[in-house]
Amino acid sequence: NNYCKIKCRSGIHTLCKYGTSTKPNCGKNVVKASGLTKQENLEILKQHNEFRQKVARGLETRGNPGPQPPAKSMNTLVWNDELAQIAQVWANQCNYGHDNCRNSAKYSVGQNIAEGSTTADNFGSVSNMVKMWEDEVKDYQYGSPKNKLNKVGHYTQMVWAKTKEIGCGSIKYIENGWHRHYLVCNYGPAGNVGNEPIYERK
């Protein structure tokens, strides 16, 4: 498996560790659905690109303080099946958190994760989870060293100008009576890199 040759700062590549099969591996949890529909893929991509455009055009009024400045340029994201496969294999472990190594041969890969939990008999939509990432903008101050990644890191990855591709995976399962919906999105090239700005302001 070629993924075993991919180097990361720490850990073994997710597809080396768990293999390339996208079968759920959730222990005693009852899996209700694994994977995203074509429609959900399109929805996630559209939601990301619409939000990126909104921010790039200077139309995002929220922030700490807002509004967010317009961007000189921002790539339009395209879907990448390899990133989606790596995301899906990780989601299938039902282990909420970031995996250690998810890079592709092309570039280092960033990641956003979200989980919805409810005792009701439904799992919540992926678009609501993506919206939670967008909403972190309310705590973001452009260019400030005071931004905390644990508060705004999903937002900053979403609008990272140099990121070009996205691929996501998801799993819905029941754990101790809780309906859990876990979404993983991988981004390449990765955002949140060192002291680089999320985008250059116009």
Curated annotation (Swiss-Prot):
<feature type="disulfide bond">
    <location>
        <begin position="168"/>
        <end position="185"/>
    </location>
</feature>
<feature type="disulfide bond">
    <location>
        <begin position="4"/>
        <end position="16"/>
    </location>
</feature>
<feature type="disulfide bond">
    <location>
        <begin position="8"/>
        <end position="101"/>
    </location>
</feature>
<dbReference type="InterPro" id="IPR035940">
    <property type="entry name" value="CAP_sf"/>
</dbReference>
<dbReference type="InterPro" id="IPR001283">
    <property type="entry name" value="CRISP-related"/>
</dbReference>
<feature type="disulfide bond">
    <location>
        <begin position="26"/>
        <end position="94"/>
    </location>
</feature>
<comment type="similarity">
    <text>Belongs to the CRISP family. Venom allergen 5-like subfamily.</text>
</comment>
<keyword id="KW-0964">Secreted</keyword>
<dbReference type="InterPro" id="IPR002413">
    <property type="entry name" value="V5_allergen-like"/>
</dbReference>
<dbReference type="GO" id="GO:0005576">
    <property type="term" value="C:extracellular region"/>
</dbReference>
<keyword id="KW-0020">Allergen</keyword>
<dbReference type="InterPro" id="IPR018244">
    <property type="entry name" value="Allrgn_V5/Tpx1_CS"/>
</dbReference>
<feature type="domain" description="SCP">
    <location>
        <begin position="46"/>
        <end position="187"/>
    </location>
</feature>
<keyword id="KW-1015">Disulfide bond</keyword>
<dbReference type="Pfam" id="PF00188">
    <property type="entry name" value="CAP"/>
</dbReference>
<protein>
    <recommendedName>
        <fullName>Venom allergen 5.01</fullName>
    </recommendedName>
</protein>
<dbReference type="InterPro" id="IPR014044">
    <property type="entry name" value="CAP_dom"/>
</dbReference>
